[in-house]
Amino acid sequence: MTGPELKKLREDLGEAIGRELTVADMAKLCGLPDPVGATTIRKWEVSGPSGPVAELLRILAMASDRYPILEMFNVFERHDVPVKERPARQQAFREQMRGDVRRRIG
């Protein structure tokens, strides 16, 4: 994930949960401590995060309709899930992810 992609993700997650996310909110999502967390996010919005944080952000991105549901989480395309139920189940999953984002930022 690049810095501009992280900044776009912050905007997209904010849109998904219905409120703008600050850099402090993103720091909470990443588990970064105050007061250095927001500063770290600002740096990452230039250089990009790495390692486990980048993977965590890829997972949290699924809260937004603008990002795909990662294959390891996509249990909706299995043969035992009726095709006409898949969109509703995917939407319910995204709502669950949005709830997780809201819970993490408090």
In which residue ranges do the predicted regions lie?
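A short, Lys/Arg-rich alpha-helix, primarily the initiator
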Residues: M1-R19
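Residue-level detection of the helix-turn-helix DNA-binding "recognition helix"
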Residues: E11, G31, R42-S47
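DNA major-groove recognition helix of helix-turn-helix/homeodomain DNA-binding modules
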Residues: P33, V46-E71
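Short coil/turn linker and secondary-structure boundary residues
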Residues: M1-P4, L21, V36, P49, ...
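Key DNA-contacting residues within the recognition helix of helix-turn-helix
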Residues: K7, A27, A38-R42, L57-R58
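Short, charged recognition helix plus adjacent turn
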Residues: M62-G106
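Short alpha-helical DNA-recognition segment
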Residues: I17-T40
